[in-house]
Amino acid sequence: ILRCLVGSEMCIRDRDKNNSEDKQKEFLGKLYANVSVLDSGARGSTTTFVENKKGDVLIAWENEALTSLASYPDEYEIVTPSVSILAQPSVAVVDDNVKVNKTEELASEYLSFLYSKQAQRIAADYGYRPTDEEVLNEYSGKFNLTIKLDTIADYGGWTQAYKIYFDDGGWFDEIYNN
């Protein structure tokens, strides 16, 4: 979510032609200064906000926000930024495991199914943004189709992004420790 916030701020700063690293860090520092609880993950943050009623604003992944809204329709409002980051959970067949368990064919079929239109619709029903454009358009009432979605490639890939933002002494440490 840190990358998403920087991405959003970068777009704002680009409009003013004042997109310096210091300005981005300043923005994030001000934001984090208002954080009353910093949970270790998305589910914990959602639980803290929605069920324990701690905090004024929850910055969450889209699926978490949609799930919360479905569970508490009259209590919350989703405010969607104009820019966010496309989060794509990794899936893989682990060769050693499927060989030992003799499940190679089943695992491969499951992996292939995940990208089918049927599976994309099931995922969309649970708040996960479909990657299939046709299916995404079927859910235009649920997902904001105008949002600009950056990818990790826009930030130099995972190795580069991790080094800059999350390594010891990176942006997160610098902002969090100040």
Regions found by a protein language model. Give the residues of each.
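Extracytoplasmic/periplasmic, Sec-exported soluble proteins
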Residues: 3, 37-41, 83, 98-106, ...
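A conserved hydrophobic position in a structured secondary element of the catalytic/binding core
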Residues: 6, 60, 115
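Extracellular/periplasmic juxtamembrane helices and adjacent flexible linkers that interface
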Residues: 98-178
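Solvent-exposed loop/turn segments at secondary-structure junctions
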Residues: 63-66, 84-86, 97-99
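Small-molecule pocket liners
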Residues: 87-91
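Ligand-binding pocket segment of bilobal, Venus flytrap-like solute-binding proteins
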Residues: 13-81
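Short loop segments at secondary-structure junctions
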Residues: 14, 95-98
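Single conserved hydrophobic/aromatic residue that forms the stacking wall/gate
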Residues: 1-7, 12
